[in-house]
Amino acid sequence: MLVLVVNCGSSSIKYQVREVTPEGSEPSPYTSSMPAINENIPLATATAGMAGDQVITKGLIENIGTSEIQDHTQALEILARRLDEELGGRTIDAAGHRVVHGGERFSAPVLVNNEIIRAIERLAPLAPLHNPAHALGLRAIQKTYPGMPQVCVFDTAFHRTMPEKAWRYAIPEQWYEMDGMRRYGFHGTSHDYVTGKACEFLGIPREQFNTVVAHLGNGASVTAIREGRSYDTSMGYTPLAGLVMGTRSGDLDPSVVTAMLERKPGMSAQDMNRILNNESGLQGICGDSDMRAVEQRADSGDERAQLALDMAAYRLAKYIGGYHVAVGGAQALIFTAGIGENSPGFRALVCDQLGALGVRLDASRNEHPEGNVARISFPDSAVEVLVVATDEERAIAEATAALVWERVKN
């Protein structure tokens, strides 16, 4: 089965076409008559028995709305022509979409119909920069590929298993009831995917696996995984909460926001949102948001860069310690995503602070991890330390194929 994986932004479409084959079965072309939608199949269950590691083609369409490409429909038409040429007449069987916010409704991947698209649009206040664009992409594919099944995979869905004590904020009840103010969590597809890969590597049944996953990119989050499910996570109502990130502040005393708004009469809520999301984090501390550049500066003796690294590592180490308690003793610590997979220096800076947990990092293995899943701790480390390559597009492709294939079989 050929699956088009799309990530629609407000002015861009990032895409991959992947070959996904249900084990023991031949791929099947899609049908335009799909049975009922199921919103309760977990991603880990949906993708069982799927192999989606072959990328046929990938690319990016940019400047939608600010160039000759007027809207997402036109962008998808251009993409369809491009894919016709690149695929040599092969047919796209289904499309899988990354959707940032599924709110409280969506706890698993879903097959798309018009009501699902409207539900995603209604969640726009929770992700105003993302969900409207996702809906545009869904409708554009409906027009470009009539009848082709589409599946949405939600960044927030994996975290729907958190207990209420973890996702509730200690704020007035009506703020939650009326305005949806609660912890949602993000990067769920990645956290879910690497947890599964770690289980396979360690030979531990998922329902018996307790771990802490650190997804470290320019945006970063850490998740407590208890019995294979999300139990707590650092991001909150928005992706601003939690760790020190490239340009995001992470956790902050709310009084800082109110005090600055009072002291700066001309500052708006929009200004504050921009500053905390785009001008803070590593950028705010040392003037650079790129971890590689910050590490290079620190190595050359730059004190501000070293402070930025120390703050980011300390914040993460504190979360890991707390989540070790939350899961009842982590069997593994997993590093993933751009920084997590590619920065041995930052991994060491974090793990050096975890001696109280019995973590013992093997410096040689940490410098040169091998394979998509690598153990970088000593054999006598009380907590296994792993580097696991994430692949959110593969997870989306496999979830898409699983739902479509199940409906075709039934």
From Swiss-Prot:
Residues annotated for ATP binding in this entry: 14, 215-219, 290-292, 338-342
Residues binding Mg(2+), per UniProt: 7, 392
GO molecular function, one term: magnesium ion binding
Location within or outside the cell: Cytoplasm
HAMAP family: Acetate_kinase
Family: Belongs to the acetokinase family.
Protein name: Acetate kinase
Gene behind this protein: ackA
